[in-house]
Amino acid sequence: MKYFLIAGEASGDLHAAHLMKALLAIDPSASFRYYGGDCMQAVGGTLLCHYRHLAYMGFVQVALHLPTILRGLRRCKAEIDSWRPDAVILVDYPGFNLKIAKYVSRQALCPVYYYISPKIWAWKEHRIHAIRRYVDRLFSILPFEVDFFEKKHHYPISYVGNPTMDEVSAYLSEHGQPRPDGHTIALLPGSRRQEITDNLSRMLQAVKPLCTEGGGEPAWHIRIAVAPSMPRDLYTAIVQRAGLPARSVQLVE
């Protein structure tokens, strides 16, 4: 079968890559074309557009890059039209993906499956109307979403487990439990440049009182999650401006 996937950020890229591997296990002849990232590309298929070119958030950033986003939408529709996949699989990223779902559904091109459902319980609950009209099957990685969709909105949804739990288990199997060498704070500033720029400096200022320079090893260790598509220089520059002791901070990919 031919699968067209769309993931618009680093987490979606990671989860979509695992989904592609699972599909290959049951459909060895599967072929993929996708909007995604490095993780999906490592599995195989054809990367049509990297998510870093479309990962904008907030009114101002979206407005500034609107021509790029609209070009991405037009190209995505054209690629689906010309390739004629057997299924379109949307991974999170609802602002873009629901527009694609609408197009594919109205053109009756193929079934539309949504993996990692839009977080309409948090905001933009009105998106349930688009989901109901244009999505054939919805898959959730958060168990409480089942009650939300089925009891509140009477829309069927399937809980398929949380891939992040699998990632944690795999990491601990490879690296073992963290060493008890003091306290650790994980900072997760996001995967988009704007998120990182806006969030990380504030996070570092919040933890700075715990990392003041003193004798011996610091009691608190700061671990910053580095997004796959972002250069490390972006993080180191923000850390330096924050004035934290270098030995207290570690970038983790």
Which residues does each predicted region cover?
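Charged active-site motifs of nucleotide-sugar-dependent glycosyltransferases
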Residues: 2, 180-186, 221
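Active-site and donor-binding regions of nucleotide-sugar-utilizing enzymes
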Residues: 3-176, 187-199, 209, 229, ...
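Glycosyltransferase donor-sugar binding loop
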Residues: 222-233
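Short beta-strand elements in bilobed, periplasmic/extracellular small-molecule ligand-binding domains
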Residues: 59-60, 219-223
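Nucleotide-activated donor-binding/catalytic signature segment of Leloir-type glycosyltransferases, i.e.
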Residues: 235-253
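Flexible, glycine/charged-enriched surface loops at secondary-structure junctions
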Residues: 216-221, 248-249
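Short hydrophobic signal-anchor/transmembrane segments that target glycosyltransferases
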Residues: 198-217
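A general structural motif
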Residues: 29, 109, 182, 217-219
